[in-house]
Curated annotation (Swiss-Prot):
Binds 1 [4Fe-4S] cluster. It is an enzyme of class 7 (translocase). Keywords: 4Fe-4S, Iron, Iron-sulfur, Membrane, Metal-binding, NAD, NADP, Plastoquinone, Quinone, Thylakoid, Translocase, Transport. Belongs to the complex I 20 kDa subunit family. The keyword RNA-binding does not apply. [4Fe-4S] cluster binds at C51, C52, C116, C147. The lineage of its organism: Bacteria, Bacillati, Cyanobacteriota, Cyanophyceae, Synechococcales. NDH-1 shuttles electrons from an unknown electron donor, via FMN and iron-sulfur (Fe-S) centers, to quinones in the respiratory and/or the photosynthetic chain. The immediate electron acceptor for the enzyme in this species is believed to be plastoquinone. Couples the redox reaction to proton translocation, and thus conserves the redox energy in a proton gradient. Cyanobacterial NDH-1 also plays a role in inorganic carbon-concentration. It is a peripheral membrane protein. GO terms for cellular component: plasma membrane-derived thylakoid membrane; respiratory chain complex I. GO terms for molecular function: 4 iron, 4 sulfur cluster binding; iron ion binding; NADH dehydrogenase (ubiquinone) activity; quinone binding. This is NAD(P)H-quinone oxidoreductase subunit K. Its cofactor is [4Fe-4S] cluster. NDH-1 can be composed of about 15 different subunits; different subcomplexes with different compositions have been identified which probably have different functions.
Length: 244
């Protein structure tokens, strides 16, 4: 029989295999990895409409180092997942803000910065154009009170948003999608049709000169100017000139 060395049941030193694994292998879950990637690479869409944005612009400088949180400002809502509303939101800008929010990809987050954005601020009592809180238009994740808030407050809001993202669960993504959450409070906002349609250059009067000018310089009158409306307007103009 060969002699066997006695086996030590509880060694004083750590096993070599376990040490190598702990130095080279990280154990995590897909959910934690997904949340870590989201909160470490937030791409904000800068939406500044008033004086609060000046404080936010100060945070972009080297003194406060906005990039330390992995935030990369974007100019297009389709590549952004965070929108920071800084300043007063008016009735005229509200449809544009909702459209920008709808164009952002899921998952998306909103930070309301300043008293005017949160509740209307000093315009909440007698203004007929200010929206009394941006949460009546889009869902808000973090509020930053102040008039205006300091850059340190913005940094604190970013930290709180990162903690909120870290606590999310991938299995609840379908339930947490920010849909059907508009107008949580009754509001008198009435969407209006777009003013700038790009078709103002296609009007008949811009496609060809007026009939009088065309006749004076010897140009043929286009068919568009020979309609009943133009003929009637021309007759009325002649009648007015005859009565003068």
């Amino acid at each position: 029989m060969t002699s066997q060395e006695p086996e030590v049941l509880f060694p004083a030193s750590a096993p070599q295999v376990t040490t190598d694994l702990s130095n080279n292998v990280v154990l995590t879950t897909v959910n934690d990895l997904y949340n870590w990637a989201k909160m470490s690479s937030l791409w904000p869409l800068l939406y500044g409409t008033a004086c609060c944005f000046i404080e936010f612009a100060a945070m972009l400088g080297s003194r406060f180092d906005f990039d330390r949180f992995g935030l990369l400002p974007r100019s297009s809502p389709r590549t952004a997942d965070l929108i920071i509303t800084a300043g007063t939101v008016t009735m005229k800008m509200a449809p544009a803000l909702v459209k920008l929010y709808q164009q952002m990809a899921e998952p998306k987050y909103v930070i309301a910065m300043g008293a005017c954005t949160i509740s209307g601020g000093m315009f909440s009592s007698d203004s007929y154009t200010a929206v009394r809180g941006v949460d009546k238009l889009i869902p808000v994740d973090v509020y930053i009170p102040g008039c205006p808030p300091r850059p340190e407050a913005i940094m604190d809001a970013i930290v709180k948003l990162r903690k909120k993202i870290a606590a999310e669960d991938m299995r609840e993504r379908g339930r947490l999608q920010q849909t059907h959450r508009y107008y949580t409070v009754k509001h008198n906002l009435k969407p209006v049709p777009e003013i700038i349609t790009g078709k103002y250059l296609e009007s008949e009067t811009r496609q060809a000169p007026p009939p009088e000018l065309a006749a004076a310089i010897g140009l043929p009158v286009p068919p568009a100017l020979q309609t009943a409306d133009f003929k009637q307007a021309e007759q009325q103009l002649k009648a007015l000139r005859g009565g003068m």
